[in-house]
């Protein structure tokens, strides 16, 4: 269990509790979680973070009424900056989006501006929102993470408790390599409910070569670990930077959707540009 799982900042969350669904607009449904909860134990300070990045959300269940009462549907794309004070708690995000269902808006841009304003207020940081009509996305191909998949290794694993031990002495040689490694075996669990979160992860780095077996064992050790998606990605970035000391590092995870939302955080200390096309499990 994470050291902050019982922190008072989490006590008021609707996550893990029985809730009523509202279908008329209510911005108060949104709830934030301080990023400092997991950053402080990692020694990460807001004024000296070793990375930049965003939390990319895809909104698949977004609907409202136009001025004449005709339902509208869209797919939303949200990017929440890493410098925001809070991350957005996903169940509250779902409940908030449901509150649009029977609410009339004059036009699509009013919806976009409302989302951007409310999310920025909750996160206490920069948020950008784009809305797409369905015909804009139809025929869009399934994407994939570029890189070498490290999953098909003939190894025995019997420990699924999180540990950084596997990353000790995980680099070899003095030669500097530049490579991208991919795993689809990332599984962590919700900090509050302990429900499973399934993801694929892409690790791009420049530095001494990282042992792929040790890296895979480390990633598999998240299997019983309880943390939010964004927190896991920052933990992985921080651990790799600390133990493997690459010159450049980017960590990008795309998680499967839950409640009509998927969360795709990335962190980097280089000029990394993430692909935003959904993966096969999304």
Swiss-Prot record:
<dbReference type="InterPro" id="IPR029139">
    <property type="entry name" value="QueF_N"/>
</dbReference>
<dbReference type="InterPro" id="IPR016428">
    <property type="entry name" value="QueF_type2"/>
</dbReference>
<dbReference type="InterPro" id="IPR029500">
    <property type="entry name" value="QueF"/>
</dbReference>
<protein>
    <recommendedName>
        <fullName>NADPH-dependent 7-cyano-7-deazaguanine reductase</fullName>
        <ecNumber>1.7.1.13</ecNumber>
    </recommendedName>
</protein>
<dbReference type="Pfam" id="PF14819">
    <property type="entry name" value="QueF_N"/>
</dbReference>
<comment type="subunit">
    <text>Homodimer.</text>
</comment>
<feature type="binding site">
    <location>
        <begin position="229"/>
        <end position="230"/>
    </location>
    <ligand>
        <name>substrate</name>
    </ligand>
</feature>
<dbReference type="Pfam" id="PF14489">
    <property type="entry name" value="QueF"/>
</dbReference>
<dbReference type="GO" id="GO:0005737">
    <property type="term" value="C:cytoplasm"/>
</dbReference>
<comment type="similarity">
    <text>Belongs to the GTP cyclohydrolase I family. QueF type 2 subfamily.</text>
</comment>
<feature type="binding site">
    <location>
        <begin position="88"/>
        <end position="90"/>
    </location>
    <ligand>
        <name>substrate</name>
    </ligand>
</feature>
<feature type="active site" description="Proton donor">
    <location>
        <position position="197"/>
    </location>
</feature>
<dbReference type="InterPro" id="IPR050084">
    <property type="entry name" value="NADPH_dep_7-cyano-7-deazaG_red"/>
</dbReference>
<feature type="binding site">
    <location>
        <begin position="258"/>
        <end position="259"/>
    </location>
    <ligand>
        <name>NADPH</name>
    </ligand>
</feature>
<dbReference type="GO" id="GO:0033739">
    <property type="term" value="F:preQ1 synthase activity"/>
</dbReference>
<feature type="binding site">
    <location>
        <begin position="90"/>
        <end position="91"/>
    </location>
    <ligand>
        <name>NADPH</name>
    </ligand>
</feature>
<dbReference type="InterPro" id="IPR043133">
    <property type="entry name" value="GTP-CH-I_C/QueF"/>
</dbReference>
<keyword id="KW-0671">Queuosine biosynthesis</keyword>
<keyword id="KW-0560">Oxidoreductase</keyword>
<keyword id="KW-0963">Cytoplasm</keyword>
<feature type="active site" description="Thioimide intermediate">
    <location>
        <position position="190"/>
    </location>
</feature>
<comment type="function">
    <text>Catalyzes the NADPH-dependent reduction of 7-cyano-7-deazaguanine (preQ0) to 7-aminomethyl-7-deazaguanine (preQ1).</text>
</comment>
<dbReference type="GO" id="GO:0008616">
    <property type="term" value="P:queuosine biosynthetic process"/>
</dbReference>
<keyword id="KW-0521">NADP</keyword>
<comment type="pathway">
    <text>tRNA modification; tRNA-queuosine biosynthesis.</text>
</comment>
<dbReference type="GO" id="GO:0006400">
    <property type="term" value="P:tRNA modification"/>
</dbReference>
């Amino acid at each position: 269990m994470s050291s902050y799982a019982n922190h008072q900042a989490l006590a008021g969350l609707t996550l893990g509790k029985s809730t009523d669904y509202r279908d008329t607009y209510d911005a108060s449904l949104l709830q934030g979680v301080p990023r400092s909860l997991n950053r402080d134990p990692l020694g990460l300070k807001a004024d000296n973070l070793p990375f930049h990045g965003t939390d990319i959300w895809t909104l698949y269940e977004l609907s409202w009424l136009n001025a004449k009462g005709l339902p509208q549907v869209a797919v939303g794309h949200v990017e929440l900056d890493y410098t925001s004070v809070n991350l957005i708690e996903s169940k509250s995000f779902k409940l908030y989006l449901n509150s649009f269902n029977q609410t009339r808006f004059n036009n699509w841009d009013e919806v976009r501006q409302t989302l951007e304003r409310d999310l920025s207020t909750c996160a206490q940081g920069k948020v950008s929102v784009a809305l797409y009509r369905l015909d804009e996305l139809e025929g869009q191909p399934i994407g994939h993470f570029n890189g070498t998949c490290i999953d098909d290794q003939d190894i025995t694993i019997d420990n699924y408790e999180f540990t950084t031990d596997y990353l000790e002495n995980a680099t070899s040689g003095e030669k500097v390599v530049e490579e991208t490694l991919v795993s689809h075996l990332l599984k962590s669990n919700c900090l509050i409910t302990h429900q499973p979160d399934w993801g694929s992860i892409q690790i791009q780095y420049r530095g001494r070569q990282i042992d792929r077996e040790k890296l895979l064992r480390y990633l598999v050790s998240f299997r019983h670990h309880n943390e939010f998606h964004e927190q896991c990605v920052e933990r992985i970035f921080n651990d790799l930077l600390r133990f493997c000391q690459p010159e450049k590092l980017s960590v990008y995870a795309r998680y499967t959707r839950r409640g009509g939302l998927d969360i795709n955080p990335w962190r980097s200390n280089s000029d990394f540009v993430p692909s935003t096309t959904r993966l096969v499990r999304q």
